[in-house]
Structure formats: structure tokens, C-alpha cells
């Protein structure tokens, strides 16, 4: 099961007493700030959670798995997330559902 933005907003309503509309706006604005910072090329550091940054990937040859045909994979920019030590410690012994 995945945690959704709606569930995050509902948690703010239940645990913090936020109005439902305000909680939804809060969650939306939180993620918009992350997106906006990354669009500007800035790193996003969330203490105790982790860092989001951009990484450039070079063009490279690839292979179509269905046909085996060689194709060119273009250069691109990707978002990477590096979890912080506190997050790594909390999830270290969590069993992953297959």
C-alpha cells in the first residue's frame, strides 16, 4: 500500500486539528516548493529525512528488450533522492512486501 497526498492531508486533520481544506493546501504547497526548487536547479535538504537533487545522465547506447535492437538513449536530467541517516535507521529492519 502506498501513502498518498490525500492520506497525508487526512493525517494533518486528525493529528494536528487542521481544517481539511487547509491541510490539503498545505500538502500541495509543500510539494510545489520541492518541485519549484528542483526546477531552479537547487538541492532540497529535509533534515532527518533526506536530500533531493538533480543528476545529469549522459547519452548512451541501449537495447530494446523486445526486439534486441540497439537504440540511442538520450542525455537527460533526473531527480535523485538520498535518504538521511535517521530515515535509513528507521527503515533498516522493515520487511518489504513482495
UniProtKB/Swiss-Prot annotation:
InterPro entries: Hist_DNA-bd, Histone-like_DNA-bd_CS, IHF-like_DNA-bd_dom_sf, IHF_alpha
A Pfam family recorded for this sequence: Bac_DNA_binding
Entry GO MF terms: DNA binding; structural constituent of chromatin
Gene Ontology annotations of biological process type: DNA recombination; positive regulation of metabolic process; regulation of DNA-templated transcription; regulation of translation
CDD domains on file: IHF_A
CC per GO annotation: cytosol
PROSITE patterns on file: HISTONE_LIKE
UniProt key word Transcription regulation: yes
Superkingdom classification of source: Bacteria
Keywords linked to the UniProt accession: DNA recombination, DNA-binding, Transcription, Transcription regulation, Translation regulation
Functional description taken from the UniProt entry: This protein is one of the two subunits of integration host factor, a specific DNA-binding protein that functions in genetic recombination as well as in transcriptional and translational control.
Entry's family note: Belongs to the bacterial histone-like protein family.
Quaternary context: Heterodimer of an alpha and a beta chain.
Name by which UniProt lists this protein: Integration host factor subunit alpha
Organism: Actinobacillus pleuropneumoniae serotype 5b (strain L20)
Gene that this sequence comes from: ihfA
Amino acid at each position: 500500500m502506498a501513502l498518498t497526498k490525500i492520506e497525508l492531508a487526512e493525517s494533518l486533520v486528525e493529528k494536528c486539528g487542521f481544517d481539511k481544506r487547509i491541510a490539503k493546501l498545505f500538502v500541495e504547497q509543500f510539494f510545489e516548493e520541492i518541485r519549484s526548487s528542483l526546477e531552479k536547479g537547487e538541492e532540497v535538504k529535509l533534515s532527518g529525512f533526506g536530500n533531493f537533487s538533480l543528476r545529469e545522465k549522459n547519452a548512451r547506447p541501449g537495447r530494446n528488450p523486445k526486439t534486441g535492437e540497439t537504440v540511442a538513449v538520450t542525455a537527460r536530467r533526473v531527480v535523485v533522492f538520498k535518504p538521511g541517516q535517521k530515515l535509513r535507521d528507521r527503515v533498516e529492519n522493515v520487511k518489504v512486501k513482495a
